[in-house]
């Protein structure tokens, strides 16, 4: 059984992110600067699959040191990388070569383990499914989080992307181990839910690369971009907001219907 999510500790070290979200999302037109940005970034040597280390300096806070694995480079914004940092359960989206808060970025000689999943059939079974994920809370209590398994993670193939109702950001765990230990349970599918292998009615194509505007409960707005569509659930997308390094996961059909 795992301890609670380590996102909170990461926010204290890397700067405060935004917590739970209740609001509305509006799709905006894509800006024209994307093509120039892609041409500048494409000349760099690929660091996907590499182990990295760097310092992090934000405002007057002391410098902290980070190590992690580069999981992916976002095609719609090649300067943006998805990174799994050691000891942190959520996936971060950072412009590793551009973000001024990142100090002394180094490519480490460490080898990344490319071991595959131990049970392919079980992996295919849990992807796209609503689940209940058990964590160990304070004083040994059990804390149950409802969420959805989104995909097998790139590079670290024994890990899976997952998001949760109470915290809709991108996490990754070794879920097959959790399933076999009884800490991950697949929830019964609702008769109203569409099959996982069929696009639900109302899915909007072509949202990747679109700019979004999010209105929070207090009326304030934040902007971001749709960077990925979840294959197992085509109505679900990853969004990277301009003011946050977390990757948010939204059902845009549900949000905009």
Swiss-Prot record:
<comment type="similarity">
    <text>Belongs to the SPIN/STSY family.</text>
</comment>
<dbReference type="GO" id="GO:0007276">
    <property type="term" value="P:gamete generation"/>
</dbReference>
<dbReference type="GO" id="GO:0005634">
    <property type="term" value="C:nucleus"/>
</dbReference>
<keyword id="KW-0131">Cell cycle</keyword>
<feature type="site" description="Histone H3K4me3 and H3R8me2a binding">
    <location>
        <position position="167"/>
    </location>
</feature>
<feature type="site" description="Histone H3K4me3 and H3R8me2a binding">
    <location>
        <position position="174"/>
    </location>
</feature>
<keyword id="KW-0539">Nucleus</keyword>
<feature type="region of interest" description="Tudor-like domain 2">
    <location>
        <begin position="127"/>
        <end position="176"/>
    </location>
</feature>
<feature type="region of interest" description="Tudor-like domain 3">
    <location>
        <begin position="208"/>
        <end position="253"/>
    </location>
</feature>
<feature type="region of interest" description="Tudor-like domain 1">
    <location>
        <begin position="48"/>
        <end position="97"/>
    </location>
</feature>
<dbReference type="GO" id="GO:0140002">
    <property type="term" value="F:histone H3K4me3 reader activity"/>
</dbReference>
<feature type="region of interest" description="Histone H3K4me3 and H3R8me2a binding">
    <location>
        <begin position="244"/>
        <end position="246"/>
    </location>
</feature>
<comment type="function">
    <text>May be involved in the regulation of cell cycle progression. Exhibits H3K4me3-binding activity.</text>
</comment>
<dbReference type="InterPro" id="IPR042567">
    <property type="entry name" value="SPIN/Ssty_sf"/>
</dbReference>
<comment type="subunit">
    <text>Interacts with C11orf84/SPINDOC.</text>
</comment>
<dbReference type="Pfam" id="PF02513">
    <property type="entry name" value="Spin-Ssty"/>
</dbReference>
<feature type="region of interest" description="Disordered">
    <location>
        <begin position="1"/>
        <end position="47"/>
    </location>
</feature>
<protein>
    <recommendedName>
        <fullName>Spindlin-2C</fullName>
    </recommendedName>
</protein>
<feature type="region of interest" description="Histone H3K4me3 and H3R8me2a binding">
    <location>
        <position position="136"/>
    </location>
</feature>
<dbReference type="InterPro" id="IPR003671">
    <property type="entry name" value="SPIN/Ssty"/>
</dbReference>
<feature type="site" description="Histone H3K4me3 and H3R8me2a binding">
    <location>
        <position position="178"/>
    </location>
</feature>
<feature type="compositionally biased region" description="Basic residues">
    <location>
        <begin position="27"/>
        <end position="43"/>
    </location>
</feature>
């Amino acid at each position: 059984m795992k301890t609670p999510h380590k996102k909170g500790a990461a926010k204290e070290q890397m700067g405060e992110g935004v917590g739970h979200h209740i609001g509305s999302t509006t799709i905006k037109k894509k800006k024209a600067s994307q093509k120039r940005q892609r041409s500048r970034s494409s000349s760099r040597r690929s660091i996907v699959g590499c182990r990295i280390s760097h310092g992090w300096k934000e405002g007057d806070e002391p410098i902290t040191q980070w190590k992690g694995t580069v999981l992916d480079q976002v095609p719609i914004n090649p300067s943006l990388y998805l990174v799994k940092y050691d000891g942190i359960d959520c996936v971060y989206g950072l412009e590793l070569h551009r973000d001024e808060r990142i100090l002394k970025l180094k490519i480490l000689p460490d080898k990344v383990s490319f071991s595959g999943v131990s049970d392919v059939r079980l992996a295919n079974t849990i992807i796209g499914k609503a689940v209940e994920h058990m964590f160990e809370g304070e004083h040994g209590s059990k804390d149950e989080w409802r969420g959805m398994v989104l995909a097998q993670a790139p590079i670290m193939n024994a890990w899976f992307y997952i998001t949760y109702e109470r915290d809709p950001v991108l996490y990754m765990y070794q879920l097959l181990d959790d399933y076999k230990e009884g800490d991950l349970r697949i929830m019964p599918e609702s008769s109203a839910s569409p099959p996982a292998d069929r696009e639900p009615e109302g899915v909007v194509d072509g949202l990747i690369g679109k700019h979004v505007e999010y209105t929070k409960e207090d009326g304030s707005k934040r902007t971001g971009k749709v960077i990925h569509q979840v294959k197992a659930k085509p109505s679900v997308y990853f969004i990277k907001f301009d003011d946050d390094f977390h990757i948010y996961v939204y059902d845009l059909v549900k949000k905009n219907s």
